[in-house]
Amino acid sequence: EKELSLWREAGADRYLLRFETSNPELYKSIHPSLTGQEPDRLELLRTIKRIGYETGSGIMVGIPGQTFDDLAKDIETFRDLDLDMIGVGPFIPHQETLLGRKAKTPGILPEEQVPNTELMTYKVMALARLVQPLANIPATSALATLNTPTGRELGLSRGANVVMPNLTPKKYRALYEIYPSKACIDETAADCRSCMHRRIRSIGRQVGEGRGDSPSYKKA
């Protein structure tokens, strides 16, 4: 807490920490901790909020072992934490990771497993908007990876209100391939900016100006 407070005093005013899942056992299975070092992300998010940061968090949809009950609890957690920003993205497996190679979901029935689909992600985004109507909710690059032609546009029509342009220099983008076939990996930052503007205008929306503070944070 002291370190977070010092950063806040030094000028930091936003903090993003995904809790990934509200199910502690599922969280441990995807983020194994060293013995005696098991951070409580939910409690840390409460501390971040109390210190005065614009607070963002979020989840993956369709993690192996994630049930619909887990997902319902996640959505309730968005509300309980009173998040200013909510990131919701599909789990896209990467075969170079242990989680990406996990073929089975032990402990749950197949029909209980949340699908990591585009449609399910839209449903969660829409529900997140209902429980936190003033939060910033991004249409993510993961959605654009699942549906390159219209993923971001559909996200903006199903609860999202912001996008996150990729400013990473083109020559470094391939070094951050967190999932296969990531969208826009060959674009320059300028290409990305003009593309985002075009996509937003295509659905009758306007590009905002200013810092982009969450309406939820402004309310507080």
Model-derived features: where do they sit?
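Conserved non-cysteine loop/helix-boundary elements of the Radical SAM core domain that shape
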Residues: E1-G52, M60-D82, T97-E118
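Auxiliary Fe-S-binding modules of radical SAM enzymes
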Residues: R79, M85-A220
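A cross-domain feature marking catalytic cores of carbohydrate-active enzymes
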Residues: F19-T21, T55-V61, V88-P90, A139-S141
